[in-house]
Amino acid sequence: MTNLEIIQELYRAFHEKDYDAFLRICTPDLEWIQNEGFPRGTIHRGAEAVVEGVFKAFDDNWESWSFDIEQYLDAGKTVIVIGSYAGRNRSTGKSFCSSAAHVYDLCDGKVSRFRQFTDTKVIWDAMN
């Protein structure tokens, strides 16, 4: 698989909750950097920690959550994904939409780092 195809597979795995596939395409020491101010925003270290602390946690707080991809930018060992989040908070019933960029670094055919850039205020507003 190309690096772009690996990132496309990552989104498929997240969407379908195929956590085994996610673990296969990430380095064990994956660094997953979510915006400070983002719900559970911090640096998650390790692919297993991302599955537990990020992916599975979405179900606790959100009735729906999506990242709609508008564009992939393939820069070799880095792949940038431009899109927008949309979601509806489970406890408040409020919805939101926020533009975002995801930056992935790959090493030897595996995702080694994720960086997120988004407006976190609209997400917090939906939670309160």
Predicted features and spans:
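Short, low-complexity N-terminal intrinsically disordered segments enriched in polar/charged residues
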Residues: 1-28, 127-128
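A beta-strand edge to alpha-helix "cap/lid" segment located at domain peripheries
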Residues: 1-2, 55-128
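Hydrophobic pocket/interface hotspot
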Residues: 7-10, 22-23, 30, 46, ...
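Generic anion/oxyanion-binding catalytic loop in active/binding sites
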Residues: 11, 39-40, 93, 112
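A solvent-exposed, acidic/Ser-Thr-rich amphipathic alpha-helical stretch
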Residues: 27-77
